[in-house]
A protein has these predicted regions:
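Helix-to-loop junction immediately C-terminal to a conserved catalytic motif
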Residues: 56
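Conserved ABC ATPase "signature" region
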Residues: 72, 119-137
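ABC ATPase NBD coupling module
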Residues: 73-89, 119
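Conserved ABC ATPase signature
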Residues: 142-146, 150
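A short, proline-enriched helix->beta-strand linker immediately N-terminal to the Walker B motif
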Residues: 161-165
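Catalytic Walker B motif of ABC-type/P-loop ATPase nucleotide-binding domains
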Residues: 167-170
Length: 180
Protein backbone atom coordinates (compact mmCIF):
# COMPACT_ATOMS: atom_id res chain seq x y z
CA UNK A 1 0.00 0.00 0.00
CA UNK A 2 1.33 3.40 -0.97
CA UNK A 3 1.88 5.52 2.19
CA UNK A 4 1.49 8.69 0.08
CA UNK A 5 -1.39 8.08 -2.33
CA UNK A 6 -1.95 10.66 -5.07
CA UNK A 7 -4.35 13.49 -4.34
CA UNK A 8 -7.98 12.76 -5.19
CA UNK A 9 -9.37 13.71 -8.56
CA UNK A 10 -12.82 13.88 -6.95
CA UNK A 11 -13.42 14.36 -3.25
CA UNK A 12 -16.90 14.42 -1.75
CA UNK A 13 -17.30 15.33 1.92
CA UNK A 14 -20.50 15.06 3.95
CA UNK A 15 -22.71 15.67 0.90
CA UNK A 16 -26.46 15.86 1.44
CA UNK A 17 -28.64 16.47 -1.58
CA UNK A 18 -32.22 16.18 -2.74
CA UNK A 19 -35.23 17.93 -4.20
CA UNK A 20 -37.18 20.67 -2.42
CA UNK A 21 -37.36 19.62 1.23
CA UNK A 22 -36.83 15.93 0.41
CA UNK A 23 -33.37 14.65 1.35
CA UNK A 24 -32.37 11.85 -1.03
CA UNK A 25 -28.70 11.52 -0.07
CA UNK A 26 -27.36 12.25 3.39
CA UNK A 27 -23.78 12.62 4.58
CA UNK A 28 -22.11 10.95 1.57
CA UNK A 29 -18.31 11.01 1.53
CA UNK A 30 -15.80 9.39 -0.83
CA UNK A 31 -12.67 10.10 -2.83
CA UNK A 32 -11.58 8.93 -6.27
CA UNK A 33 -7.88 9.03 -7.06
CA UNK A 34 -6.21 9.09 -10.49
CA UNK A 35 -6.85 5.95 -12.55
CA UNK A 36 -9.53 4.72 -10.15
CA UNK A 37 -13.02 3.83 -11.32
CA UNK A 38 -16.03 4.23 -9.06
CA UNK A 39 -19.30 2.41 -9.67
CA UNK A 40 -22.39 3.48 -7.75
CA UNK A 41 -24.76 0.53 -7.63
CA UNK A 42 -28.22 0.43 -6.10
CA UNK A 43 -31.86 -0.16 -6.68
CA UNK A 44 -34.19 2.03 -8.66
CA UNK A 45 -34.85 5.32 -6.89
CA UNK A 46 -32.00 5.00 -4.39
CA UNK A 47 -30.29 8.25 -5.44
CA UNK A 48 -27.68 7.30 -8.05
CA UNK A 49 -28.84 9.91 -10.56
CA UNK A 50 -29.33 12.45 -7.76
CA UNK A 51 -25.70 11.94 -6.75
CA UNK A 52 -24.61 12.54 -10.35
CA UNK A 53 -26.68 15.72 -10.53
CA UNK A 54 -25.04 16.99 -7.33
CA UNK A 55 -21.56 16.09 -8.59
CA UNK A 56 -21.95 17.99 -11.86
CA UNK A 57 -23.74 21.00 -10.41
CA UNK A 58 -27.28 20.43 -11.68
CA UNK A 59 -28.45 20.23 -8.06
CA UNK A 60 -27.17 22.42 -5.25
CA UNK A 61 -26.25 20.33 -2.21
CA UNK A 62 -28.06 21.00 1.07
CA UNK A 63 -24.67 20.63 2.75
CA UNK A 64 -21.19 19.27 2.14
CA UNK A 65 -18.59 19.82 -0.54
CA UNK A 66 -17.63 18.42 -3.93
CA UNK A 67 -14.05 19.14 -5.01
CA UNK A 68 -12.23 18.38 -8.26
CA UNK A 69 -8.42 18.32 -8.29
CA UNK A 70 -8.44 19.97 -4.86
CA UNK A 71 -10.71 22.86 -5.91
CA UNK A 72 -14.15 23.19 -4.36
CA UNK A 73 -16.85 23.00 -7.01
CA UNK A 74 -19.55 23.68 -4.44
CA UNK A 75 -18.00 26.98 -3.28
CA UNK A 76 -16.70 28.07 -6.69
CA UNK A 77 -17.95 31.21 -8.40
CA UNK A 78 -19.32 31.05 -11.97
CA UNK A 79 -15.97 31.44 -13.83
CA UNK A 80 -14.30 28.85 -11.57
CA UNK A 81 -17.18 26.42 -12.03
CA UNK A 82 -16.92 26.85 -15.81
CA UNK A 83 -13.21 25.98 -15.68
CA UNK A 84 -13.93 22.90 -13.57
CA UNK A 85 -16.76 21.83 -15.90
CA UNK A 86 -14.26 21.65 -18.77
CA UNK A 87 -12.45 18.82 -16.98
CA UNK A 88 -15.27 16.31 -17.25
CA UNK A 89 -17.67 14.75 -19.69
CA UNK A 90 -21.16 13.48 -18.87
CA UNK A 91 -23.29 10.81 -20.47
CA UNK A 92 -26.86 11.05 -19.27
CA UNK A 93 -29.25 8.13 -18.95
CA UNK A 94 -31.34 9.41 -21.87
CA UNK A 95 -28.20 10.35 -23.89
CA UNK A 96 -29.45 13.97 -24.21
CA UNK A 97 -28.82 14.33 -27.93
CA UNK A 98 -30.48 17.29 -29.65
CA UNK A 99 -32.97 15.80 -32.11
CA UNK A 100 -32.76 18.78 -34.50
CA UNK A 101 -28.98 18.47 -34.84
CA UNK A 102 -26.84 15.97 -36.74
CA UNK A 103 -24.41 13.75 -34.86
CA UNK A 104 -21.56 16.01 -35.97
CA UNK A 105 -23.35 19.04 -34.54
CA UNK A 106 -24.17 17.20 -31.29
CA UNK A 107 -20.59 16.02 -30.77
CA UNK A 108 -19.24 19.46 -31.66
CA UNK A 109 -21.28 21.27 -28.98
CA UNK A 110 -18.70 21.07 -26.14
CA UNK A 111 -15.94 22.09 -28.55
CA UNK A 112 -17.89 25.18 -29.60
CA UNK A 113 -18.78 26.04 -26.00
CA UNK A 114 -15.41 25.49 -24.32
CA UNK A 115 -12.72 26.05 -26.97
CA UNK A 116 -11.72 28.54 -29.63
CA UNK A 117 -10.83 25.85 -32.17
CA UNK A 118 -11.38 26.51 -35.84
CA UNK A 119 -14.28 24.81 -37.59
CA UNK A 120 -11.82 22.52 -39.42
CA UNK A 121 -10.19 21.46 -36.14
CA UNK A 122 -13.59 20.82 -34.54
CA UNK A 123 -14.66 18.73 -37.55
CA UNK A 124 -11.45 16.69 -37.30
CA UNK A 125 -12.07 15.97 -33.61
CA UNK A 126 -15.72 15.09 -34.25
CA UNK A 127 -14.72 12.62 -36.98
CA UNK A 128 -12.07 11.08 -34.72
CA UNK A 129 -14.42 10.70 -31.74
CA UNK A 130 -17.22 9.21 -33.84
CA UNK A 131 -14.71 6.77 -35.34
CA UNK A 132 -13.43 5.82 -31.87
CA UNK A 133 -16.95 4.79 -30.81
CA UNK A 134 -17.71 2.88 -34.02
CA UNK A 135 -19.83 5.54 -35.75
CA UNK A 136 -17.49 6.54 -38.58
CA UNK A 137 -19.38 8.00 -41.52
CA UNK A 138 -22.48 8.84 -39.49
CA UNK A 139 -21.76 12.55 -39.02
CA UNK A 140 -24.82 13.70 -40.99
CA UNK A 141 -27.32 11.34 -39.35
CA UNK A 142 -29.90 12.62 -36.86
CA UNK A 143 -30.56 10.93 -33.50
CA UNK A 144 -33.96 9.69 -34.75
CA UNK A 145 -32.09 7.60 -37.34
CA UNK A 146 -30.08 5.71 -34.71
CA UNK A 147 -30.66 2.66 -32.54
CA UNK A 148 -30.48 3.03 -28.76
CA UNK A 149 -26.93 1.66 -28.68
CA UNK A 150 -25.81 4.02 -31.43
CA UNK A 151 -27.28 6.97 -29.50
CA UNK A 152 -25.35 5.89 -26.40
CA UNK A 153 -22.13 5.73 -28.44
CA UNK A 154 -22.83 9.17 -29.96
CA UNK A 155 -23.31 10.54 -26.43
CA UNK A 156 -19.98 8.94 -25.48
CA UNK A 157 -18.28 10.63 -28.45
CA UNK A 158 -19.65 13.98 -27.30
CA UNK A 159 -18.56 13.37 -23.70
CA UNK A 160 -15.03 12.57 -24.89
CA UNK A 161 -14.76 15.48 -27.34
CA UNK A 162 -12.75 17.64 -24.92
CA UNK A 163 -10.54 14.74 -23.77
CA UNK A 164 -11.85 15.10 -20.22
CA UNK A 165 -9.97 13.96 -17.14
CA UNK A 166 -13.21 12.58 -15.68
CA UNK A 167 -16.22 10.99 -17.36
CA UNK A 168 -19.53 10.50 -15.56
CA UNK A 169 -22.01 7.91 -16.80
CA UNK A 170 -25.65 7.63 -15.73
CA UNK A 171 -26.79 4.07 -16.50
CA UNK A 172 -23.71 3.39 -18.66
CA UNK A 173 -24.70 0.06 -20.17
CA UNK A 174 -28.35 0.88 -20.91
CA UNK A 175 -29.07 0.46 -24.60
CA UNK A 176 -25.64 -0.90 -25.54
CA UNK A 177 -25.27 -4.05 -27.57
CA UNK A 178 -23.12 -6.77 -25.93
CA UNK A 179 -20.58 -6.56 -28.76
CA UNK A 180 -20.13 -2.77 -28.67
Amino acid sequence: MNPNPPAPVIEVKNLSCGYGATVVLQDVSFAVRPREVLFVIGGSGCGKSTLLRCLIGLLKPFQGDVAYFGKSFTAADAPQRRDILKTFGVIYQNNALWSSMTLAENVSLPLEEHTSLSRADREEIVTLKLTEVGLAGSEELYPSELSGGMKKRAALARALALDPAIVFFDEPSEGLDPIT
